[in-house]
């Protein structure tokens, strides 16, 4: 029998996860929940996704907009084997009691506190840790990207210390209230940014320092990475290792892709839905070794890189596949791999 999946929150992440669920051979989308009858609610109806009211007091708003509802979020959660909470940061914590009341395991997004959950999750790094957990946090877009990078390096060479400067987009394309508009902000000014401690929820013993900047861009995040390894491979060997990973894309120098804008254009030309890039995008010519120090640049698409992770987390919690089986199925159905 297919896994019955509910998605609570049908915005940037939720709509992508819902679409991904419908592509899985072992899953069925029970429905999605929205707080308001906006264009995304209309999209859910057009996609024939059963739509539920996330806030009961707003049912009249949906009716006034001519949008038919399948019920309330309580009914959605009750009908599901597992729920993906894709609500804005902080709302997942408010929803936890709802999921517990229905004894439905829940996945939360990286904006929630690690203290909220039993385990933080990355499919490449700690898939098995989520087995039978009631509350699992799929780490943020940046932490997902760093975990995918650090896992093979740790396994193959050992990591003595990681240092990362994250140049973060100011907001997503649809977040008109975010910024900066004309500024470059240390965010935060003090060390570390939250990303290092977040990586430690996946790799508890890893020595990592992170710094963050926010810039007036919406396309992607960019990471400047320095990792001191416990051995001294050459750059070609490291590049080959990273190229072998299923959710990394080493950008060939010959492609002429010199920034996030061309990466998004590349994704559109390849027919990616919403121009999504699920993979870490690593500039191949940036992969350099100085002694035991590795340097590279990578770009992370903040709207989509966690989508395959959510799909894998569903299987991890319910124990329906091992890590390799799940990632292979997810990658094949979504079309991961450039």
Curated annotation (Swiss-Prot):
Keywords: Cytoplasm, Glycolysis, NAD, NADP, Oxidoreductase. It is an enzyme of class 1 (oxidoreductase). NAD(+) binds at residues 12-13, 111, 169, 302. Pathway: Carbohydrate degradation; glycolysis; pyruvate from D-glyceraldehyde 3-phosphate: step 1/5. GO terms for biological process: glycolytic process. It is found in: Cytoplasm. InterPro entries: GlycerAld/Erythrose_P_DH, GlycerAld_3-P_DH_AS, GlycerAld_3-P_DH_cat, GlycerAld_3-P_DH_NAD(P)-bd, Glyceraldehyde-3-P_DH_2_arc, NAD(P)-bd_dom_sf. Gene3D superfamilies: Dihydrodipicolinate Reductase, domain 2, NAD(P)-binding Rossmann-like Domain. D-glyceraldehyde 3-phosphate binds at residues 140-142, 195-196. The active site is at 141 (nucleophile). PROSITE patterns: GAPDH. Its main location: cytoplasm. One of its GO terms (cellular component) is cytoplasm. It catalyses: D-glyceraldehyde 3-phosphate + phosphate + NADP(+) = (2R)-3-phospho-glyceroyl phosphate + NADPH + H(+); D-glyceraldehyde 3-phosphate + phosphate + NAD(+) = (2R)-3-phospho-glyceroyl phosphate + NADH + H(+). It holds the Pfam family Gp_dh_C. GO terms for molecular function: glyceraldehyde-3-phosphate dehydrogenase (NAD+) (phosphorylating) activity; glyceraldehyde-3-phosphate dehydrogenase (NADP+) (phosphorylating) activity; NAD binding; NADP binding. Its EC number is 1.2.1.59. The keyword NADP applies. Belongs to the glyceraldehyde-3-phosphate dehydrogenase family. Homotetramer. HAMAP family: G3P_dehdrog_arch. This is Glyceraldehyde-3-phosphate dehydrogenase.
């Amino acid at each position: 029998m297919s896994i019955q999946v509910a998605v609570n929150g049908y915005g940037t992440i939720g709509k992508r996860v819902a679409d991904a669920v419908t592509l899985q051979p072992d899953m069925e989308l029970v429905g999605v929940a929205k707080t308001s009858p906006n264009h995304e609610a209309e999209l859910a109806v057009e996609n024939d996704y059963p739509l539920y009211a996330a806030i009961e007091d707003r049912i009249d708003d949906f009716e006034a907009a001519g949008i038919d509802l399948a019920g309330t979020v309580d009914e959605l959660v009750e009908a599901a084997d597992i729920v993906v909470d894709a609500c804005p940061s902080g709302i997942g914590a408010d929803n936890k009691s709802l999921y517990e009341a229905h004894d439905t395991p829940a996945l939360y997004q990286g904006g929630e506190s690690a203290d909220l959950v039993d385990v933080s999750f990355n499919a490449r790094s700690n898939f098995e840790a989520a087995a039978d957990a009631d509350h699992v946090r799929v780490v943020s877009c940046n932490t997902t990207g760093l975990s995918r990078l650090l896992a093979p390096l740790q396994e193959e060479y050992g990591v003595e210390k990681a240092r990362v400067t994250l140049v973060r987009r100011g907001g997503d394309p649809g977040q008109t209230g975010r910024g900066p508009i004309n500024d470059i902000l240390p965010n935060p000014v003090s060390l570390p940014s939250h990303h290092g401690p977040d990586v430690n929820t996946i790799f508890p013993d890893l020595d990592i320092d992170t710094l963050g900047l926010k810039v007036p861009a919406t396309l992607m995040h960019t990471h400047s990475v320095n990792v001191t390894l416990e051995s001294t491979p050459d750059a070609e060997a490291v590049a080959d290792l990273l190229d072998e990973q299923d959710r990394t894309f080493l950008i060939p120098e010959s492609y002429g892709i010199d920034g996030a804008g061309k990466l998004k254009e590349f994704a559109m030309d390849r027919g990616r839905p919403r121009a999504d890039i699920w993979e870490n995008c690593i500039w191949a010519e940036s992969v350099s070794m100085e002694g035991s120090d590795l340097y590279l640049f990578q770009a992370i698409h903040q709207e989509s890189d966690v989508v395959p992770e959510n799909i894998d987390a569903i299987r991890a919690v319910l124990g329906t596949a091992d890590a390799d089986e799940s990632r292979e199925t997810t990658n094949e159905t979504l079309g991961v791999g450039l």
